[in-house]
Amino acid sequence: MSDTLLTLRDVHINFPARKNWLGKTTEHVHAINGIDLQIRRGETLGIVGESGCGKSTLAQLLMGMLQPSHGQYIRSGSQRIMQMVFQDPLSSLNPRLPVWRIITEPLWIAKRSSEQQRRALAEELAVQVGIRPEYLDRLPHAFSGGQRQRIAIARALSSQPDVIVLDEPTSALDISVQAQILNLLVTLQENHGLTYVLISHNVSVIRHMSDRVAVMYLGQIVELGDAQQVLTAPAHPYTRLLLDSLPAIDKPLEEEWALRKTDLPGNRTLPQGCFFYERCPLATHGCEVRQSLAIREDGRELRCWRAL
């Protein structure tokens, strides 16, 4: 059995941005720009980057909500079951359904199981995620933010998925609750043999959970490797700047490492060379050409000729 569950090969996703009077698209938004990626069985792959880099678009692609404009998205196996846990638990739960029906809705859609079977499953999953079974007839508004996210996690588990995409699973929660949810996810992964794709702009969350980390910038992966390597000794200039931007009391940012431009380039007209060229403090001759993802000696994949 292959250890690779999902494979992306040179995937691009474009959205129409402007049309002429004939209805023909004249301008596109380039959300994903040539991603090559393999997701392995049992791992947690962290996806990190600033707002607008394409993280959530990648999540929608993995879930099948979007199709590639170019390239291939391959799922190994005949029936690869995937689920998603969303950023805001309240908006992702039906306010008119009791919790037991919310948790078992994927099972009802797939198999039309009896109410007795679904109630039994809801009670079992509720215990696993830390919700008391006697609360299952309540509506979502009766729960706190952390409890709602536990309900969303239980719903994702109900169809026995192979892969769960976690799109900012703790960003809408209080700090005191975030660690509880992360620890719950780790426990469930061990018990169910799950594979996670964890999407976040919070480097601390990525550091806590991930086996590998992919750093995204303007719809591309610029650095991919072991989480410990990437987060402690970043090789790509963008990764280093991203980590240096985290608040630190006794670690001022070196002047030569300041961004040349603070604004993220637009994604309607892509840069001609390296996508980070206009902002990179190390930009020099050779950076004006497109950079491909190359493998370094330590096994990391980088999109920067200077860091190889």
Swiss-Prot record:
UniProt entry tagged with the keyword Cell inner membrane: yes
Record key words, sorted: ATP-binding, Cell inner membrane, Cell membrane, Membrane, Nucleotide-binding, Peptide transport, Protein transport, Transport
Positions that bind ATP: G49, E50, S51, G52, C53, G54, K55, S56
Gene Ontology MF term list: ATP binding; ATP hydrolysis activity
Domain ABC transporter: 8-243
Any one Gene Ontology BP term: transmembrane transport
CDD domains registered for this protein in UniProt: ABC_NikE_OppD_transporters (cd03257)
Recorded GO CC terms: ATP-binding cassette (ABC) transporter complex, substrate-binding subunit-containing; membrane
Membrane topology term: Peripheral membrane protein
UniProt-listed Pfam families: ABC_tran (PF00005), oligo_HPY (PF08352)
Subcellular location: Cell inner membrane
SUPFAM superfamilies: P-loop containing nucleoside triphosphate hydrolases (SSF52540)
Stored Gene3D superfamilies: P-loop containing nucleotide triphosphate hydrolases
Protein induction: Induced by RpoS in stationary phase.
Record function comment: Part of the ABC transporter complex DdpABCDF, which is probably involved in D,D-dipeptide transport. Probably responsible for energy coupling to the transport system.
Protein's name according to its UniProt entry: Probable D,D-dipeptide transport ATP-binding protein DdpF
Organism: Escherichia coli (strain K12)
